[in-house]
Amino acid sequence: MPDYLLSINNQVLLCYFISKNSVSKSKGDKEMKSKKYGMMLAVLAAAGGVSVSAAPVPVYELKGLTVTATRQAETTKDVPANVQIVTEKEIKDRNVQNAAQAVALATGVHVDTTVEGSVNLRGYNSKNILVLVDGQQMNTAWNSTVDWNMIPVENIRKVEVVSGGQSALYGGRAVGGFINNMTKSAKENGVHGAVNLGYGSHNTVKQSYMASGRKDRLNWGIFYESKITDGWRSYLSSYAIKNSKGKNNFTGVDTSSLDTTADGKEYIIGDRGKKEVMSESYGFNLGYDFTEDRKLTYKFTHSNYTWKYTDPRSYLSAGFSKPSGVPASTFFGNRGWRVYDMHSLTYNDQKDKIHAHFGMTDYTKSGYITPDKTVKASRTFDGAGSKTSYPSKSWDFDLNKRWTAGSHTILFGGSYGKDRFDETIYKTVSDWKSWDSTVKGNKDDQWLGGKAKSWALYIQDKWKLSSRWAAYIGGRYDYYEKYGGYNYYRGKAPTRLESDSYHQFSPKLSASYALDNHTNLYLSFGKSFAPPLLYQLYRYAEPSYGGRYEPNPSLKPETTTNWELGIKKDMGKTKISADLFYARTKDYIDLVTIGKTAKGADIKTYKNVGEARTHGAELSVTHKFSSLWSVYANYTWQLGKVADADNGYAMGRDYEIPRHLFHSGVTYTNHPWTVNVDSMFVSARNEPGWKSGKFKSRDAYFLLNMDTAYAVNKNLSVQFSIYNILDREYYDQESASDKYYAGDGRTFTLSARYSF
């Protein structure tokens, strides 16, 4: 049993996705809708879950090993970076429901409380965080986002989270850090398996089944995981009070009961309804051990994800018909589909210290359908719509080798990657609720896309200067090319967009100093190279809410300089870690308004706007009072500034980054019981003049949560969790987009695990 627990950041986000007494955010009213738990009782009678041990494993183990941070096995305390490990045991003990919540257990991570659960690390979203599964990139080729619900959390063995710029070893997407999700494989002969079943008051059902086995040199595994939820009314419908000419859009409409958005420019006229989500993943792995040191492993995952809004509501006395000109999608939202296949082939030779990986992530289906003006409430919301599809595909290959020469451990490697996407926009399809709906040819139907490829060489020398000093000296040379961009309308000749190439050397220099056996100091400096995303280069879109997004194939890569200074201290029952970090980005890419449409809506595109800066400090403290009680607290202060295109490109605050994050909690462990009570505070991020407590605000909020686990026996356990015990109401913005949402209220989840 481990004696100490280090801070577990964002534990409070563990159970929002499961059951709930739903809280409507419509007009301040609350609709308490009770749910039946008969299914869960049947589940408990028939099955169960993995056994719960006497104490949770620490998220960040000073004696733990990381194989990701420096591409070689090292103890986390010796690595000159903020490295954290989330273990399989902790994922189970904390009743984690999706991969984003697993990452949220790490210090410095902020996960929004939407169904998707976007991740923010030190002010960076997934566009600048490299996310891997068994070394295979999960960031989409289309826009670098990560579908966290499509990563099967029950199949995760551990998660390694490395904060700060890591481009010298991992390339352009690792500007803010990287996250590697490592999945399970059988270690011992025989067959093993697990079942996890859960139910909640959102009518949420989660189920996972897995089995693995080994026979001498051959190992295998299979898994299936799914999650279905009715969701809550997270997205409110709003419409501009005045049009572009200053005319009131609500003339003759009773607005006395309507609330406004945070900026006061729009009325809240309804909500899109509950957001129903279905995620499903299944796959297998095969491994063969040529010897104890030489292994070949193939892993395959197929994942399917869909969402839709149901039961939209209007807050207007005239229902969905007024004011005139409001697009149907304002009330009804859209429906989305995503399907991907992931292939991963890895060869690992511990004897000769050779590692090779080849992978492909293929989003065969990705897009959405938006209802058009023919969709009406009187016709059960049936009708036509417009369809946008943007499948994408990524390939990558990496090969490296290590040598040891005296006090030097040298790593040398190379990588190659290729991305592509193809977007199709059909202006009219017969049924907006069906992906396979009949396309009605329209002269404005559009096809566009593009490609990018890169290759790189990297080197790192770990130089053990003395028993106390170690230096890491290295760098990476990247060559990047964007090409094959095209754009054409139905019946028109294609327009070829410009191609270009860039190259960059990204150095990295770090030093670690052991003051004594219990205290380590480290200092790190590095540069990062981040090429523009394909959708920033080549995407064209006309959203249902108006306006237009135009491509910009002239974008240049961003370059970022990173500094970090930190300390890790073990004082027996108390552990302390602290760090300071700074990042400065040149040629920062941001979305800017470049004009107006004929109807006065914004025309936007991505541009290199200038500079962006982020700096901050992190402090984490844990203390163990006894074998039964332990506590933790951690605090993050961070500030982001960016060139503001609407203010003459002067530096201004980046309001998407919360300045203050605070987490604390207490754990009680007395076998067979384990109880965790956690809290989280996120500071407000509203722009000047914006009001809190309204839709489209980024509120400050405090959440209190509890998780209880009971081990029935060594194979069976039962868990019960409450998220947002105080039933706080708040509004926020998704971490990886410009979408706003109403936070979920009090949530309950009951689950059972059984292993064999």
Question: Model-derived features: where do they sit?
Answer:
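C-terminal beta-signal and adjacent terminal beta-strands/loops
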Residues: 15-17, 235-236, 529, 584-586, ...
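Transmembrane beta-barrel wall of Gram-negative outer-membrane proteins
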Residues: 199-228, 236-308, 339-346, 404
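Short acidic/polar hinge/loop motifs at secondary-structure boundaries
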Residues: 137-164
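N-terminal periplasmic accessory domains that precede
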Residues: 97-102, 117-120, 132, 147-152, ...
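Structural signature of Gram-negative outer-membrane beta-barrels, strongest in the C-terminal barrel
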Residues: 291, 407-411, 415, 448-584, ...
